[in-house]
UniProtKB/Swiss-Prot annotation, chain B:
Protein name, entry field: NAD(P)H-quinone oxidoreductase subunit H, chloroplastic
Species annotation: Amborella trichopoda
The protein's role, per its UniProt record: NDH shuttles electrons from NAD(P)H:plastoquinone, via FMN and iron-sulfur (Fe-S) centers, to quinones in the photosynthetic chain and possibly in a chloroplast respiratory chain. The immediate electron acceptor for the enzyme in this species is believed to be plastoquinone. Couples the redox reaction to proton translocation, and thus conserves the redox energy in a proton gradient.
Catalytic activity field: a plastoquinone + NADH + (n+1) H(+)(in) = a plastoquinol + NAD(+) + n H(+)(out); a plastoquinone + NADPH + (n+1) H(+)(in) = a plastoquinol + NADP(+) + n H(+)(out)
NCBIfam families per UniProt: PRK06075.1 (NF004739), PRK07415.1 (NF005649)
Record's keyword terms, sorted: Chloroplast, Membrane, NAD, NADP, Plastid, Plastoquinone, Quinone, Thylakoid, Translocase, Transport
Protein backbone atom coordinates (compact mmCIF):
# COMPACT_ATOMS: atom_id res chain seq x y z
CA UNK A 1 0.00 0.00 0.00
CA UNK A 2 1.40 3.38 -0.80
CA UNK A 3 0.40 6.95 -0.15
CA UNK A 4 -2.43 6.96 -2.63
CA UNK A 5 -4.21 3.84 -1.49
CA UNK A 6 -4.24 4.79 2.17
CA UNK A 7 -5.51 8.20 1.19
CA UNK A 8 -8.14 6.84 -1.15
CA UNK A 9 -9.28 4.19 1.29
CA UNK A 10 -9.71 6.62 4.15
CA UNK A 11 -11.55 9.05 1.92
CA UNK A 12 -14.06 6.39 1.03
CA UNK A 13 -14.48 5.09 4.54
CA UNK A 14 -15.02 7.87 7.00
CA UNK A 15 -17.98 10.27 7.04
CA UNK A 16 -17.72 12.98 4.45
CA UNK A 17 -18.39 15.78 6.88
CA UNK A 18 -15.06 15.16 8.60
CA UNK A 19 -12.97 16.75 5.87
CA UNK A 20 -13.86 19.86 4.02
CA UNK A 21 -10.86 19.84 1.71
CA UNK A 22 -8.55 17.19 0.47
CA UNK A 23 -5.54 17.56 -1.70
CA UNK A 24 -3.29 15.03 -3.24
CA UNK A 25 0.00 15.91 -4.83
CA UNK A 26 3.28 14.23 -5.43
CA UNK A 27 4.60 16.05 -2.39
CA UNK A 28 2.15 14.45 -0.04
CA UNK A 29 -1.56 14.16 0.57
CA UNK A 30 -3.49 16.20 3.02
CA UNK A 31 -6.85 16.42 4.68
CA UNK A 32 -8.27 19.68 5.92
CA UNK A 33 -10.65 19.24 8.76
CA UNK A 34 -12.62 21.12 11.34
CA UNK A 35 -11.44 21.36 14.92
CA UNK A 36 -14.52 19.43 16.05
CA UNK A 37 -13.69 16.39 13.98
CA UNK A 38 -9.94 16.47 14.40
CA UNK A 39 -9.71 14.00 17.26
CA UNK A 40 -12.12 11.60 15.57
CA UNK A 41 -10.23 11.73 12.33
CA UNK A 42 -6.90 11.06 14.00
CA UNK A 43 -8.43 8.28 16.08
CA UNK A 44 -9.76 6.68 12.90
CA UNK A 45 -6.43 7.02 11.13
CA UNK A 46 -4.53 5.59 14.04
CA UNK A 47 -6.60 2.55 14.83
CA UNK A 48 -8.26 1.49 11.61
CA UNK A 49 -6.68 -1.63 10.18
CA UNK A 50 -6.05 -0.35 6.70
CA UNK A 51 -4.65 3.00 7.65
CA UNK A 52 -2.76 2.31 10.92
CA UNK A 53 -1.11 5.67 11.08
CA UNK A 54 0.58 5.14 14.40
CA UNK A 55 3.40 7.62 14.38
CA UNK A 56 2.87 11.32 14.89
CA UNK A 57 5.86 12.90 13.26
CA UNK A 58 5.21 16.57 13.74
CA UNK A 59 2.67 19.16 14.82
CA UNK A 60 3.35 22.43 13.10
CA UNK A 61 1.64 25.76 13.45
CA UNK A 62 1.43 28.21 10.57
CA UNK A 63 0.31 31.80 10.69
CA UNK A 64 -1.61 33.34 7.80
CA UNK A 65 -2.55 36.75 9.11
CA UNK A 66 -4.62 37.57 6.05
CA UNK A 67 -7.13 34.84 6.82
CA UNK A 68 -9.93 35.11 9.32
CA UNK A 69 -8.89 31.94 11.08
CA UNK A 70 -5.29 32.88 10.99
CA UNK A 71 -3.54 29.86 12.42
CA UNK A 72 -3.31 26.54 10.78
CA UNK A 73 -2.17 23.53 12.77
CA UNK A 74 -0.66 20.77 10.67
CA UNK A 75 -0.32 17.21 11.91
CA UNK A 76 2.24 15.19 9.97
CA UNK A 77 1.62 11.48 10.37
CA UNK A 78 3.38 8.33 9.31
CA UNK A 79 2.29 4.75 9.03
CA UNK A 80 5.22 2.40 9.42
CA UNK A 81 3.03 -0.57 8.55
CA UNK A 82 2.10 0.78 5.12
CA UNK A 83 5.03 3.18 4.65
CA UNK A 84 2.90 6.17 3.86
CA UNK A 85 2.59 9.66 5.18
CA UNK A 86 -0.39 11.91 5.44
CA UNK A 87 -1.05 15.43 6.67
CA UNK A 88 -4.09 16.59 8.59
CA UNK A 89 -4.63 20.31 8.90
CA UNK A 90 -7.09 22.39 10.86
CA UNK A 91 -7.49 26.11 11.20
CA UNK A 92 -7.95 28.11 14.32
CA UNK A 93 -7.97 31.72 15.36
CA UNK A 94 -6.53 33.26 18.49
CA UNK A 95 -9.27 32.06 20.79
CA UNK A 96 -10.21 28.70 19.33
CA UNK A 97 -9.13 25.77 21.42
CA UNK A 98 -8.20 22.56 19.70
CA UNK A 99 -8.67 19.23 21.41
CA UNK A 100 -5.37 17.70 22.31
CA UNK A 101 -4.29 14.40 20.85
CA UNK A 102 -1.95 13.48 23.69
CA UNK A 103 -4.13 10.53 24.63
CA UNK A 104 -3.68 9.12 21.14
CA UNK A 105 -0.08 10.03 20.47
CA UNK A 106 2.02 10.65 23.59
CA UNK A 107 4.63 12.40 21.49
CA UNK A 108 2.15 15.23 20.95
CA UNK A 109 2.82 16.50 24.46
CA UNK A 110 5.76 18.71 23.69
CA UNK A 111 4.65 19.55 20.16
CA UNK A 112 1.43 21.06 21.46
CA UNK A 113 3.34 22.96 24.09
CA UNK A 114 5.49 24.37 21.34
CA UNK A 115 2.50 25.40 19.23
CA UNK A 116 1.03 27.11 22.29
CA UNK A 117 4.31 28.82 23.07
CA UNK A 118 5.08 29.96 19.56
CA UNK A 119 1.59 30.83 18.31
CA UNK A 120 -0.83 31.00 21.18
CA UNK A 121 -3.16 28.22 20.08
CA UNK A 122 -4.35 26.46 23.17
CA UNK A 123 -5.36 22.84 23.51
CA UNK A 124 -8.11 21.28 25.58
CA UNK A 125 -7.21 18.32 27.78
CA UNK A 126 -3.53 18.83 27.55
CA UNK A 127 -1.91 17.62 30.78
CA UNK A 128 0.72 20.32 30.97
CA UNK A 129 0.27 23.30 28.67
CA UNK A 130 3.00 25.82 29.36
CA UNK A 131 5.89 27.41 27.59
CA UNK A 132 8.67 25.20 26.37
CA UNK A 133 11.20 27.09 24.33
CA UNK A 134 10.97 30.72 25.35
CA UNK A 135 12.49 32.28 28.40
CA UNK A 136 10.82 32.23 31.84
CA UNK A 137 8.40 35.13 31.99
CA UNK A 138 8.46 35.75 28.26
CA UNK A 139 5.47 37.61 26.91
CA UNK A 140 4.18 37.16 23.44
CA UNK A 141 4.09 34.42 20.90
CA UNK A 142 7.24 34.61 18.76
CA UNK A 143 6.35 32.83 15.56
CA UNK A 144 3.33 34.96 14.79
CA UNK A 145 3.92 37.14 11.79
CA UNK A 146 3.32 40.34 13.73
CA UNK A 147 6.06 39.57 16.23
CA UNK A 148 9.29 41.16 15.00
CA UNK A 149 12.37 39.05 14.37
CA UNK A 150 14.40 40.93 16.92
CA UNK A 151 11.76 40.69 19.62
CA UNK A 152 10.78 43.39 22.07
CA UNK A 153 13.11 42.88 25.01
CA UNK A 154 16.74 42.17 25.41
CA UNK A 155 18.37 40.59 28.44
CA UNK A 156 21.58 41.44 30.14
CA UNK A 157 23.26 40.70 33.42
CA UNK A 158 22.92 43.63 35.77
CA UNK A 159 25.82 43.78 38.19
CA UNK A 160 24.23 46.01 40.88
CA UNK A 161 21.18 43.77 41.04
CA UNK A 162 23.24 40.61 40.61
CA UNK A 163 20.78 38.97 38.23
CA UNK A 164 19.66 38.94 34.64
CA UNK A 165 17.26 41.75 33.73
CA UNK A 166 15.02 42.24 30.70
CA UNK A 167 14.94 45.64 29.10
CA UNK A 168 13.28 47.01 26.01
CA UNK A 169 15.41 46.46 22.97
CA UNK A 170 17.97 49.01 21.94
CA UNK A 171 19.11 48.92 18.33
CA UNK A 172 22.44 50.59 17.83
CA UNK A 173 22.20 50.20 14.05
CA UNK A 174 19.22 51.05 11.94
CA UNK A 175 17.50 48.06 10.43
CA UNK A 176 18.64 47.58 6.84
CA UNK A 177 16.54 45.59 4.46
CA UNK A 178 18.28 43.96 1.51
CA UNK A 179 15.96 42.89 -1.24
CA UNK A 180 17.47 39.64 -2.46
CA UNK A 181 14.93 39.18 -5.20
CA UNK A 182 15.69 42.39 -6.99
CA UNK A 183 18.63 42.49 -9.41
CA UNK A 184 19.32 46.18 -8.79
CA UNK A 185 22.23 47.15 -6.65
CA UNK A 186 21.05 48.09 -3.17
CA UNK A 187 22.14 51.37 -1.68
CA UNK A 188 21.68 52.26 1.94
CA UNK A 189 19.99 55.55 1.17
CA UNK A 190 17.16 53.74 -0.59
CA UNK B 1 21.24 14.36 73.34
CA UNK B 2 18.67 14.57 70.60
CA UNK B 3 18.88 12.05 67.81
CA UNK B 4 18.37 13.73 64.43
CA UNK B 5 15.27 12.35 62.79
CA UNK B 6 15.49 10.90 59.32
CA UNK B 7 13.20 12.66 56.94
CA UNK B 8 11.31 10.60 54.43
CA UNK B 9 9.95 13.18 52.10
CA UNK B 10 10.91 13.37 48.49
CA UNK B 11 13.93 15.37 47.41
CA UNK B 12 13.75 17.62 44.43
CA UNK B 13 17.15 17.96 42.86
CA UNK B 14 18.06 20.21 39.99
CA UNK B 15 20.52 18.88 37.43
CA UNK B 16 21.14 22.31 36.12
CA UNK B 17 21.56 23.50 32.57
CA UNK B 18 25.33 23.21 32.65
CA UNK B 19 26.53 19.64 32.29
CA UNK B 20 30.03 18.25 32.39
CA UNK B 21 29.19 15.96 29.49
CA UNK B 22 28.46 17.23 26.05
CA UNK B 23 24.70 16.95 25.96
CA UNK B 24 24.32 20.67 26.00
CA UNK B 25 22.16 22.90 28.13
CA UNK B 26 19.39 20.69 29.43
CA UNK B 27 17.84 21.20 32.81
CA UNK B 28 16.43 18.17 34.61
CA UNK B 29 14.34 18.54 37.73
CA UNK B 30 14.52 15.16 39.38
CA UNK B 31 12.29 14.04 42.22
CA UNK B 32 14.07 11.47 44.31
CA UNK B 33 13.11 9.11 47.05
CA UNK B 34 16.52 8.31 48.42
CA UNK B 35 18.29 6.84 45.43
CA UNK B 36 15.19 5.93 43.42
CA UNK B 37 13.89 8.33 40.86
CA UNK B 38 10.21 9.13 41.15
CA UNK B 39 9.93 11.64 38.36
CA UNK B 40 12.12 13.66 36.10
CA UNK B 41 11.11 16.79 34.25
CA UNK B 42 13.26 18.08 31.44
CA UNK B 43 13.18 21.82 30.84
CA UNK B 44 14.30 22.96 27.44
CA UNK B 45 14.74 26.27 25.78
CA UNK B 46 18.17 27.29 26.97
CA UNK B 47 19.55 27.14 23.45
CA UNK B 48 16.52 28.45 21.61
CA UNK B 49 17.78 30.81 18.94
CA UNK B 50 14.69 31.33 16.83
CA UNK B 51 15.96 29.35 13.84
CA UNK B 52 12.50 28.96 12.41
CA UNK B 53 11.70 32.63 12.51
CA UNK B 54 15.07 33.51 11.01
CA UNK B 55 14.35 31.10 8.16
CA UNK B 56 11.32 33.14 7.21
CA UNK B 57 13.60 36.06 6.47
CA UNK B 58 16.45 34.44 4.63
CA UNK B 59 16.82 32.91 1.22
CA UNK B 60 17.96 29.32 1.14
CA UNK B 61 21.52 30.19 0.26
CA UNK B 62 21.63 32.75 3.05
CA UNK B 63 20.19 30.25 5.49
CA UNK B 64 22.66 27.45 4.86
CA UNK B 65 25.25 28.66 7.39
CA UNK B 66 22.57 28.63 10.10
CA UNK B 67 21.51 25.06 9.66
CA UNK B 68 24.76 23.48 10.73
CA UNK B 69 24.17 24.99 14.14
CA UNK B 70 21.13 22.78 14.79
CA UNK B 71 22.89 19.48 15.14
CA UNK B 72 26.44 20.66 15.32
CA UNK B 73 27.95 17.20 15.37
CA UNK B 74 26.33 15.76 12.28
CA UNK B 75 26.37 18.89 10.20
CA UNK B 76 26.07 17.38 6.75
CA UNK B 77 22.60 16.06 7.54
CA UNK B 78 21.17 19.43 8.42
CA UNK B 79 22.62 20.89 5.23
CA UNK B 80 21.36 17.95 3.20
CA UNK B 81 17.83 18.41 4.40
CA UNK B 82 17.95 22.17 3.87
CA UNK B 83 18.76 21.72 0.22
CA UNK B 84 16.55 18.67 -0.20
CA UNK B 85 13.48 20.72 0.64
CA UNK B 86 13.77 23.24 -2.25
CA UNK B 87 15.02 20.53 -4.57
CA UNK B 88 11.88 18.54 -4.06
CA UNK B 89 9.76 21.64 -4.28
CA UNK B 90 11.24 22.56 -7.63
CA UNK B 91 11.74 19.00 -8.86
CA UNK B 92 15.44 19.53 -9.36
CA UNK B 93 17.53 16.53 -10.32
CA UNK B 94 20.89 16.06 -8.74
CA UNK B 95 23.75 14.73 -10.91
CA UNK B 96 24.91 11.26 -9.98
CA UNK B 97 28.41 12.33 -9.10
CA UNK B 98 27.06 14.99 -6.76
CA UNK B 99 24.75 12.41 -5.23
CA UNK B 100 27.68 10.09 -4.56
CA UNK B 101 29.69 12.91 -3.01
CA UNK B 102 26.70 13.73 -0.83
CA UNK B 103 26.34 10.14 0.32
CA UNK B 104 30.03 9.93 1.17
CA UNK B 105 29.86 13.14 3.18
CA UNK B 106 26.66 12.07 4.92
CA UNK B 107 28.06 8.73 5.96
CA UNK B 108 31.28 10.31 7.19
CA UNK B 109 29.15 12.70 9.20
CA UNK B 110 27.19 9.79 10.61
CA UNK B 111 30.41 8.15 11.77
CA UNK B 112 31.50 11.45 13.31
CA UNK B 113 28.22 11.84 15.15
CA UNK B 114 28.20 8.32 16.51
CA UNK B 115 31.81 8.72 17.63
CA UNK B 116 30.96 11.83 19.54
CA UNK B 117 27.98 10.09 21.03
CA UNK B 118 30.16 7.23 22.22
CA UNK B 119 32.72 9.37 24.01
CA UNK B 120 30.39 11.30 26.33
CA UNK B 121 28.22 8.22 26.82
CA UNK B 122 31.19 6.30 28.19
CA UNK B 123 32.30 9.35 30.16
CA UNK B 124 28.86 9.58 31.79
CA UNK B 125 29.08 5.95 32.76
CA UNK B 126 32.53 6.55 34.16
CA UNK B 127 34.99 5.32 31.54
CA UNK B 128 37.14 8.25 30.52
CA UNK B 129 39.43 6.51 28.03
CA UNK B 130 37.18 6.11 24.97
CA UNK B 131 36.64 9.87 25.06
CA UNK B 132 40.21 10.43 23.90
CA UNK B 133 40.12 7.66 21.33
CA UNK B 134 37.05 9.03 19.61
CA UNK B 135 38.56 12.45 19.32
CA UNK B 136 41.59 10.95 17.66
CA UNK B 137 39.33 9.50 14.96
CA UNK B 138 37.22 12.59 14.78
CA UNK B 139 40.29 14.70 14.08
CA UNK B 140 40.98 12.57 11.02
CA UNK B 141 37.44 13.18 9.87
CA UNK B 142 37.87 16.89 10.46
CA UNK B 143 40.95 16.80 8.25
CA UNK B 144 39.00 15.11 5.47
CA UNK B 145 36.19 17.62 5.76
CA UNK B 146 38.57 20.53 5.85
CA UNK B 147 40.30 19.59 2.63
CA UNK B 148 37.00 18.96 0.86
CA UNK B 149 34.87 21.80 2.17
CA UNK B 150 37.14 24.33 3.76
CA UNK B 151 35.80 24.08 7.29
CA UNK B 152 36.29 21.49 10.02
CA UNK B 153 32.79 21.49 11.37
CA UNK B 154 30.32 24.02 9.95
CA UNK B 155 30.85 23.16 6.35
CA UNK B 156 28.29 25.03 4.23
CA UNK B 157 29.03 22.49 1.54
CA UNK B 158 25.66 21.48 0.08
CA UNK B 159 23.93 23.53 -2.56
CA UNK B 160 20.59 23.24 -4.30
CA UNK B 161 21.28 20.73 -7.05
CA UNK B 162 24.51 19.26 -5.76
CA UNK B 163 27.52 20.27 -3.75
CA UNK B 164 29.56 23.44 -3.73
CA UNK B 165 32.87 22.08 -4.98
CA UNK B 166 34.25 18.85 -6.32
CA UNK B 167 36.50 16.66 -4.22
CA UNK B 168 40.12 17.77 -4.28
CA UNK B 169 43.00 15.78 -5.72
CA UNK B 170 43.85 12.70 -3.69
CA UNK B 171 40.82 12.94 -1.44
CA UNK B 172 39.42 9.60 -2.48
CA UNK B 173 42.66 7.81 -1.63
CA UNK B 174 42.82 9.58 1.73
CA UNK B 175 39.27 8.61 2.49
CA UNK B 176 39.91 4.98 1.61
CA UNK B 177 42.92 5.08 3.91
CA UNK B 178 40.69 6.41 6.67
CA UNK B 179 38.22 3.56 6.15
CA UNK B 180 40.99 0.99 6.32
CA UNK B 181 42.30 2.62 9.49
CA UNK B 182 38.92 2.96 11.11
CA UNK B 183 37.61 -0.58 10.99
CA UNK B 184 40.28 -1.99 13.33
CA UNK B 185 39.66 0.99 15.63
CA UNK B 186 36.01 0.07 15.97
CA UNK B 187 37.12 -3.45 16.74
CA UNK B 188 39.35 -1.95 19.44
CA UNK B 189 36.39 -0.12 20.96
CA UNK B 190 34.41 -3.30 20.97
CA UNK B 191 37.23 -5.19 22.64
CA UNK B 192 37.49 -2.45 25.24
CA UNK B 193 33.83 -1.85 25.91
CA UNK B 194 31.33 -4.37 24.67
CA UNK B 195 32.13 -7.31 26.87
CA UNK B 196 33.40 -5.28 29.78
CA UNK B 197 31.49 -6.54 32.83
CA UNK B 198 31.30 -3.12 34.49
CA UNK B 199 29.88 -1.62 31.33
CA UNK B 200 27.34 -4.41 31.00
CA UNK B 201 26.27 -4.00 34.61
CA UNK B 202 25.58 -0.33 34.04
CA UNK B 203 23.92 -0.63 30.72
CA UNK B 204 22.13 -3.94 30.31
CA UNK B 205 18.42 -3.81 31.05
CA UNK B 206 18.50 -0.08 31.69
CA UNK B 207 15.95 2.09 29.98
CA UNK B 208 13.87 -0.56 28.30
CA UNK B 209 11.53 0.57 25.55
CA UNK B 210 9.03 -1.91 24.17
CA UNK B 211 8.23 -2.02 20.48
CA UNK B 212 4.70 -0.64 20.84
CA UNK B 213 5.88 2.12 23.09
CA UNK B 214 8.59 3.15 20.67
CA UNK B 215 6.06 3.53 17.87
CA UNK B 216 3.58 5.37 20.07
CA UNK B 217 6.11 7.87 21.25
CA UNK B 218 7.21 8.58 17.71
CA UNK B 219 10.81 7.55 18.20
CA UNK B 220 13.07 7.17 15.22
CA UNK B 221 16.61 6.29 14.38
CA UNK B 222 18.69 4.01 16.55
CA UNK B 223 16.17 4.21 19.39
CA UNK B 224 13.51 2.65 17.21
CA UNK B 225 15.84 0.13 15.64
CA UNK B 226 17.08 -1.01 19.03
CA UNK B 227 13.53 -1.89 20.05
CA UNK B 228 13.05 -4.39 17.27
CA UNK B 229 11.70 -2.36 14.36
CA UNK B 230 14.02 -2.33 11.34
CA UNK B 231 12.83 1.06 10.11
CA UNK B 232 15.51 3.03 8.31
CA UNK B 233 14.60 5.95 6.06
CA UNK B 234 17.53 5.24 3.80
CA UNK B 235 15.97 1.95 2.81
CA UNK B 236 12.36 2.99 2.99
CA UNK B 237 12.46 6.30 1.19
CA UNK B 238 15.01 5.44 -1.51
CA UNK B 239 16.59 8.84 -1.46
CA UNK B 240 19.95 9.93 -2.83
CA UNK B 241 21.64 6.85 -4.24
CA UNK B 242 21.59 4.51 -1.27
CA UNK B 243 19.90 1.85 -3.37
CA UNK B 244 23.00 1.36 -5.42
CA UNK B 245 25.01 0.11 -2.48
CA UNK B 246 24.90 -3.17 -0.69
CA UNK B 247 24.25 -2.62 2.99
CA UNK B 248 21.92 -3.80 5.74
CA UNK B 249 19.75 -2.08 8.30
CA UNK B 250 21.22 -2.64 11.75
CA UNK B 251 18.73 -3.44 14.43
CA UNK B 252 18.43 -5.23 17.75
CA UNK B 253 15.54 -6.69 19.68
CA UNK B 254 16.19 -5.96 23.31
CA UNK B 255 15.30 -2.29 23.53
CA UNK B 256 17.60 -1.39 26.39
CA UNK B 257 20.60 0.91 26.44
CA UNK B 258 22.93 -1.91 25.48
CA UNK B 259 20.90 -2.55 22.34
CA UNK B 260 21.12 1.12 21.39
CA UNK B 261 24.85 1.04 21.89
CA UNK B 262 25.16 -2.04 19.68
CA UNK B 263 22.99 -0.50 16.97
CA UNK B 264 25.15 2.60 16.81
CA UNK B 265 28.42 0.67 16.76
CA UNK B 266 27.21 -1.55 13.94
CA UNK B 267 25.88 1.49 12.10
CA UNK B 268 29.38 2.92 12.14
CA UNK B 269 30.75 -0.25 10.56
CA UNK B 270 27.94 -0.27 8.01
CA UNK B 271 28.67 3.35 7.15
CA UNK B 272 32.27 2.46 6.44
CA UNK B 273 31.04 -0.22 4.05
CA UNK B 274 28.84 2.27 2.25
CA UNK B 275 31.66 4.80 2.00
CA UNK B 276 34.04 2.25 0.56
CA UNK B 277 31.52 1.21 -2.07
CA UNK B 278 30.73 4.82 -2.92
CA UNK B 279 34.37 5.77 -3.25
CA UNK B 280 35.07 2.90 -5.57
CA UNK B 281 31.97 3.47 -7.66
CA UNK B 282 31.85 7.26 -7.93
CA UNK B 283 30.97 8.34 -11.49
CA UNK B 284 34.06 9.76 -13.08
CA UNK B 285 36.41 8.48 -10.44
CA UNK B 286 38.84 10.75 -8.60
CA UNK B 287 38.93 14.35 -9.66
CA UNK B 288 42.34 14.09 -11.30
CA UNK B 289 41.12 11.37 -13.65
CA UNK B 290 37.92 13.23 -14.44
CA UNK B 291 39.88 16.36 -15.21
CA UNK B 292 42.24 14.50 -17.48
CA UNK B 293 39.38 12.93 -19.37
CA UNK B 294 37.63 16.23 -19.84
CA UNK B 295 40.70 17.79 -21.38
CA UNK B 296 41.37 14.82 -23.62
CA UNK B 297 42.38 15.48 -27.18
CA UNK B 298 39.35 13.76 -28.62
CA UNK B 299 36.69 15.65 -26.72
CA UNK B 300 34.34 12.96 -25.50
CA UNK B 301 30.91 14.35 -24.79
CA UNK B 302 30.30 11.78 -22.09
CA UNK B 303 32.75 13.17 -19.52
CA UNK B 304 31.10 16.57 -19.66
CA UNK B 305 27.67 15.10 -19.25
CA UNK B 306 25.17 15.90 -16.51
CA UNK B 307 25.95 12.78 -14.51
CA UNK B 308 29.59 13.68 -13.98
CA UNK B 309 28.96 17.14 -12.60
CA UNK B 310 28.80 18.47 -9.15
CA UNK B 311 27.04 21.85 -9.02
CA UNK B 312 29.17 24.97 -8.91
CA UNK B 313 29.19 27.45 -6.10
CA UNK B 314 26.71 29.92 -7.49
CA UNK B 315 23.15 28.82 -8.03
CA UNK B 316 20.78 31.69 -8.41
CA UNK B 317 20.38 33.61 -5.16
CA UNK B 318 16.84 34.43 -6.15
CA UNK B 319 15.69 30.82 -6.20
CA UNK B 320 11.95 31.11 -5.78
CA UNK B 321 10.02 28.63 -3.69
CA UNK B 322 6.68 27.86 -5.26
CA UNK B 323 3.52 28.00 -3.21
CA UNK B 324 3.42 24.38 -2.06
CA UNK B 325 3.83 22.49 1.15
CA UNK B 326 5.95 19.49 1.59
CA UNK B 327 7.67 17.45 4.24
CA UNK B 328 11.15 16.13 3.51
CA UNK B 329 13.07 13.87 5.81
CA UNK B 330 16.48 12.30 6.12
CA UNK B 331 17.86 9.58 8.32
CA UNK B 332 20.09 11.58 10.63
CA UNK B 333 22.25 9.68 13.12
CA UNK B 334 19.88 10.71 15.89
CA UNK B 335 16.67 9.80 14.10
CA UNK B 336 14.35 11.25 11.53
CA UNK B 337 15.26 14.83 10.81
CA UNK B 338 12.54 16.57 8.87
CA UNK B 339 11.65 19.93 7.40
CA UNK B 340 8.08 20.96 6.77
CA UNK B 341 8.34 23.70 4.21
CA UNK B 342 5.58 26.00 2.98
CA UNK B 343 6.74 28.07 0.08
CA UNK B 344 5.27 31.38 -0.86
CA UNK B 345 6.23 32.20 -4.46
CA UNK B 346 9.05 34.31 -3.14
CA UNK B 347 12.64 33.82 -2.15
CA UNK B 348 11.75 33.48 1.52
CA UNK B 349 9.84 30.48 2.84
CA UNK B 350 6.54 31.18 4.55
CA UNK B 351 7.02 28.51 7.17
CA UNK B 352 10.10 26.47 7.85
CA UNK B 353 9.39 23.90 10.50
CA UNK B 354 12.25 21.81 11.75
CA UNK B 355 11.37 18.38 13.08
CA UNK B 356 14.32 17.51 15.28
CA UNK B 357 14.79 13.86 16.25
CA UNK B 358 16.25 14.92 19.59
CA UNK B 359 13.06 16.62 20.78
CA UNK B 360 10.92 13.55 20.23
CA UNK B 361 13.49 11.12 21.57
CA UNK B 362 13.93 13.24 24.67
CA UNK B 363 10.23 13.24 25.43
CA UNK B 364 10.30 9.63 26.53
CA UNK B 365 12.94 10.33 29.19
CA UNK B 366 10.56 10.97 32.13
CA UNK B 367 8.89 7.69 31.49
CA UNK B 368 12.09 5.72 31.21
CA UNK B 369 13.65 6.90 34.45
CA UNK B 370 10.66 6.27 36.65
CA UNK B 371 11.82 3.05 38.21
CA UNK B 372 15.51 3.63 37.95
CA UNK B 373 18.26 4.75 40.29
CA UNK B 374 19.81 8.18 40.15
CA UNK B 375 22.93 6.96 38.39
CA UNK B 376 20.85 5.44 35.63
CA UNK B 377 19.51 8.80 34.52
CA UNK B 378 22.81 9.70 32.89
CA UNK B 379 23.08 6.32 31.24
CA UNK B 380 19.62 6.61 29.76
CA UNK B 381 20.10 10.23 28.78
CA UNK B 382 23.36 9.32 27.11
CA UNK B 383 21.87 6.41 25.24
CA UNK B 384 19.09 8.59 23.85
CA UNK B 385 21.77 10.70 22.12
CA UNK B 386 20.45 14.23 22.09
CA UNK B 387 22.00 17.48 21.01
CA UNK B 388 20.37 20.53 22.49
CA UNK B 389 21.17 22.58 19.43
CA UNK B 390 18.54 20.76 17.47
CA UNK B 391 16.12 20.19 20.35
CA UNK B 392 15.87 23.89 21.07
CA UNK B 393 16.70 25.26 17.63
Amino acid sequence: MDNQSIFQYSLETFPKKWVHLMERSEHGNRFDTNTDYLFKLLYFLKFHTYTRVQVLIDICGVDYPSRKRRFEVVYNLLSTRYNSRIRVQTSADEVTRISSVVSLFPSAGWWEREVWDMFGVSFINHPDLRRILTDYGFEGHPLRKDFPLSGYVEVRYDDPEKRVVSEPIEMTQEFRYFDSASPWEQRSDG
Amino acid sequence: MTVPATRNDLMIVNMGPHHPSMHGVLRLIVTLDGEDVIDCEPILGYLHRGMEKIAENRTIIQYLPYVTRWDYLATMFTEAITVNAPEELGNIQVPRRASYIRVIMLELSRIASHLLWLGPFMADIGAQTPFFYIFRERELLYDLFETATGMRMMHNFFRIGGVAADLPHGWIDKCLDFCDYFLPEVAEYQKLITRNPIFLERVEGVGFIAEEEAINWGLSGPMLRASGIPWDLRKVDHYECYDEFDWEVQWQKEGDSLARYLVRISEMIESVKIIQQALEGIPGGPYENLEARRFDRVRNIEWNDFEYRFISKKPSPTFELSKQELYVRVEAPKGELGIFLIGDNSVFPWRWKIRPPGLINLQILPQLVKRMKLADIMTILGSIDIIMGEVDR
